[in-house]
């Protein structure tokens, strides 16, 4: 089934995906409902303020410190780099950065994507005849405070760049007159001298300025956003002090089982400011997160829950859970369930994946997420709800390019529990019990005709055994850099 019909079946009001003809989804006719329980709360270690950008009385009090990216940084995960291999195969890569401000109960989610970068601009008739239709370009989206939205997109990718082996990327939508667009990480002052509209992101630094391009008529938008903040990673993807892991295991080094997914920073602390429309948000040690995905296209349908702000727990807690129905490699359209739940807590990662246990879920088309999983030693259970209407977001699709394909909210009410698993499979000692009112929740793809119940119990045993083999491809291939694939 084409992505167009899949998403329309998810929401019959989504009838057009062309970027020049914005969609008109259900949320346009709904007034988001904010539960009376969802109120700002105070976190002693986080400082945040809001002011107008041009206020004379509110001086800039937060000045983030730029640190250049080092080649052997701590907590670096595999697959931090840009995976484009230079071939004309269908390909996209996307990045997601989130900053949460608990005192204001607001989040900012930055989403970047590049599509078919082998073609730096729209395909010519000859290229279409040779390679088939492709959608090209670079997109930047922000889901920000008060569920407002901003999107800037262009079909050319001449000014997009990404580091082959590190989480360093950027794009220039509009250069300062007389200046040359950067093609690598540059200090903040130089970026501001050369880039009028664009962004750059690294593990330690994130800055940019983008303007809404007017293509969105289904959500409340802001005209522009500007930001600068630094980040101190706390969790990568693995135990603190240990070698960090590939989220999807060693097969992620190869173009099979796509799309691939890598959490680059399960948790960090960010300091800086974001100008969002007419407001300025300043923050110190705000919980932050980053992830990425890449490959030929998104899953057929999927769900996702992520949270870094919790009550009732000591220390840093980070949750990432997600799953989907993805196509298996081959000539036939065969799909499998894939999912994971991972919690970083007290310096340790509690990992629940198909190759070390079973993940089960129950998802409504919108508003309810329930996931439980177990491995040899632990059991986890999470439940998330939202009364918010959510905001439709765009994602790179193979059929129609950057198009509305999912729905998100950062106001999810979440309960998370982890127990020790006893010899008979029952729950033992409670390791973690916590809750949040700032979970990010998402559903995507389709069709979503009703509740989706699924699990990973049918994961082939051969695949489970293969994924448990402790292959360190990053180190092995690093001995011969010529053979090390891009991104790894």
UniProtKB/Swiss-Prot annotation:
Keyword annotations: Chloroplast, Isomerase, Plastid, Transit peptide
Q: Look up the domain of life of the source.
A: Eukaryota
Q: What is its EC number?
A: 5.5.1.24
Q: One Pfam annotation, family name?
A: Tocopherol_cycl
What chemistry does it catalyse, as a reaction equation?
delta-tocopherol = 2-methyl-6-phytyl-1,4-benzene-1,4-diol; gamma-tocopherol = 2,3-dimethyl-6-phytylbenzene-1,4-diol; delta-tocotrienol = 6-geranylgeranyl-2-methylbenzene-1,4-diol; gamma-tocotrienol = 6-geranylgeranyl-2,3-dimethylbenzene-1,4-diol
Q: Name one GO biological process term.
A: regulation of defense response
Task: Give the subcellular location.
Answer: Plastid, Chloroplast, Plastoglobule
Please provide, alphabetically and separated by semicolons, the GO molecular function terms listed in this UniProt record. Answer: isomerase activity; tocopherol cyclase activity
Residue range of the transit peptide? 1-76
**Protein's UniProt keywords contain Chloroplast:** yes
What GO cellular component entries does it have?
Answer: chloroplast; chloroplast envelope; chloroplast inner membrane; chloroplast thylakoid; plasma membrane; plastoglobule
What pathway, per the record?
A: Cofactor biosynthesis; tocopherol biosynthesis
Entry-linked InterPro entries: Tocopherol_cyclase
Q: What does this protein do?
A: Involved in the synthesis of both tocopherols and tocotrienols (vitamin E), which presumably protect photosynthetic complexes from oxidative stress. Catalyzes the conversion of 2-methyl-6-phytyl-1,4-hydroquinone and 2,3-dimethyl-5-phytyl-1,4-hydroquinone (DMPQ) to delta- and gamma-tocopherol respectively. Also converts 2,3-dimethyl-5-geranylgeranyl-1,4-hydroquinone (DMGQ) to gamma-tocotrienol.
Q: What is this protein called?
A: Tocopherol cyclase, chloroplastic
Q: What is the lineage of its organism?
A: Eukaryota, Viridiplantae, Streptophyta, Embryophyta, Tracheophyta
